[in-house]
Amino acid sequence: MQLLCVFCLVLLWEVGAASLSEVKLHLDIEGHASHYTIPWTELMAKVPGLSPEALWREANVTEDLASMLNRYKLIYKTSGTLGIALAEPVDIPAVSEGSMQVDASKVHPGVISGLNSPACMLSAPLEKQLFYYIGTMLPNTRPHSYVFYQLRCHLSYVALSINGDKFQYTGAMTSKFLMGTYKRVTEKGDEHVLSLIFGKTKDLPDLRGPFSYPSLTSAQSGDYSLVIVTTFVHYANFHNYFVPNLKDMFSRAVTMTAASYARYVLQKLVLLEMKGGCREPELDTETLTTMFEVSVAFFKVGHAVGETGNGCVDLRWLAKSFFELTVLKDIIGICYGATVKGMQSYGLERLAAMLMATVKMEELGHLTTEKQEYALRLATVGYPKAGVYSGLIGGATSVLLSAYNRHPLFQPLHTVMRETLFIGSHVVLRELRLNVTTQGPNLALYQLLSTALCSALEIGEVLRGLALGTESGLFSPCYLSLRFDLTRDKLLSMAPQEAMLDQAAVSNAVDGFLGRLSLEREDRDAWHLPAYKCVDRLDKVLMIIPLINVTFIISSDREVRGSALYEASTTYLSSSLFLSPVIMNKCSQGAVAGEPRQIPKIQNFTRTQKSCIFCGFALLSYDEKEGLETTTYITSQEVQNSILSSNYFDFDNLHVHYLLLTTNGTVMEIAGLYEERAHVVLAIILYFIAFALGIFLVHKIVMFFL
């Protein structure tokens, strides 16, 4: 429905001065016209603060033709509208029959019984919360005042600045349209402004005369348009460093669903962050395009909600879409220091937190993958209203433990598992970044399992994803692991050697991976581990393995005040390798734990499958030249049996060693399988010698009697 309101001001002249007596209102709704006359005094009572003088100035009906023509000539006109036939997706799914309808403004305990209960949220109250703020959508400043009437309304916005306030971007949005405005102040103090407007053509704001949208529209398809508003001078200035592919920008904004579009933008930002684009952002096409796309991601969610009118929005869709926006909000805050106002519903957050309170977090890993992801998304969305943080970590850890137990050893994560763990990781990330986690075992277990999943093949898969720009580079357990040994040379040796991969792209992928593992990141800190206080030289730590009752700190020097000290002294490592168990989180009283102990060898490693005698232990492998390879945490008999029945131990490579780390702080090297093989080979050789000797003796006896 399009509503056109035309105010006719009737001026009565009294003593040479103009005064407003009444307002004549003409309403034209889809061809049906109505006329009303409202006394000004009555209108002022209903709308206090409404100034007739301001209305008169804004209408500018006395503007002469020359001024109007000059204003028209200043504004940039497109060379032509790019018409594209695009398929517009059905974003919000139909609400299932029997769904509980929830009013976002009236969420109370017990409104939904649990995760299995279908539910939806009424669109109108939800939209009102998303666009709660009142602000100036269309400012009374040039060039906007040349083209639009000033507009204040309920809105949301994304705002950021680069180089102080020299460059600013604001993506202001209603549920109808988005206006992304770039503003740059030059060294001379000149200000250049350019705006991109996206939305349904029929819902775009009214224009001043003599403008029309066809001359301003860059791209159009079906219901949607992309409009440029700037002056010719400002356009020429921006064109020096901002030449966006408007066709691609517009096509993605129209054809992608809200959640998939937000994920696309998130992936761009992750890659940008890894390349250092956050620390030193370039004012180029890629950066400026990404800024606009960030605001489009937020707009598409609010727009989809608004398009349902007086309907109801499926809660699963809301959980998925607002999870993506939450993650996106986190990274633009970290990357650009961006501010997001609005696009947040306290009703949705409260409902999500209440639903999570009905779930036994420690049993979350036993649910289906679909329910795990739904619950973890709700946990992220409802985090501000959750209250109890440790329970959420327990849920993410339960899901990770379940995935770890059924994951093949040393294999990269498959797509579905990577997505599930990516969703769960943001519960952990939020607590680490907000510095609210206490010394809980759940977080230690989460990081231990992440460390165990960070194998050479997993690293290779992530590097491939980063080099090709695919989603496999978006998340890896390595990002939340306690591995600190991954250098550039080591990562290059793990990178896939494929003809399709450009070596420059691989090199950039390695740099990005290293950037993601930077110790300056909050999520790479191990401050929450009690044994952390026993470490004096953090730059010498290679890996931390927190087991039950003992934490092993592997380092390249002896400066760890642990309960004991082991050294891999029989190797040819270019740098030393020390293992310091910290038992019951108690540091040694002295500077170090004394002289290194000899690591004993197990010559007969038993292949038992009847009981889990190694549960709670960890296996650590290292190469005499390359250093640490990987660690495996034995969580169950299935994991133990998988280790014993597979080719886990590569004893053909005599330069690789396997250490067993126990829960009492003891370290042992496993060499039994190699010794078994040697005994078998020796037995075969002795049998062959005996057989040959027997044949020789028989030959001599036969020859003697002949």
Swiss-Prot record:
Glycans are attached at residues 60, 435, 549, 604, 664. Disulfide bonds join 278-335, 454-478, 534-587, 612-615. The keyword Cytoplasm does not apply. GO terms for biological process: fusion of virus membrane with host plasma membrane; symbiont entry into host cell. Residues 1-18 form the signal peptide. Keywords: Disulfide bond, Fusion of virus membrane with host cell membrane, Fusion of virus membrane with host membrane, Glycoprotein, Host cell membrane, Host endosome, Host membrane, Membrane, Sialic acid, Signal, Transmembrane, Transmembrane helix, Viral envelope protein, Viral penetration into host cytoplasm, Virion, Virus entry into host cell. Residues 19-682 are virion surface. The keyword Membrane applies. It is found in: Virion membrane; Host cell membrane; Host endosome membrane. It is a single-pass type I membrane protein. Belongs to the herpesviridae glycoprotein H family. The heterodimer glycoprotein H-glycoprotein L is required for the fusion of viral and plasma membranes leading to virus entry into the host cell. Following initial binding to host receptor, membrane fusion is mediated by the fusion machinery composed of gB and the heterodimer gH/gL. May also be involved in the fusion between the virion envelope and the outer nuclear membrane during virion morphogenesis. The heterodimer gH/gL targets also host EPHA2 to promote viral entry. This is Envelope glycoprotein H. It comes from Epstein-Barr virus (strain GD1) (HHV-4). The lineage of its organism: Viruses, Duplodnaviria, Heunggongvirae, Peploviricota, Herviviricetes.
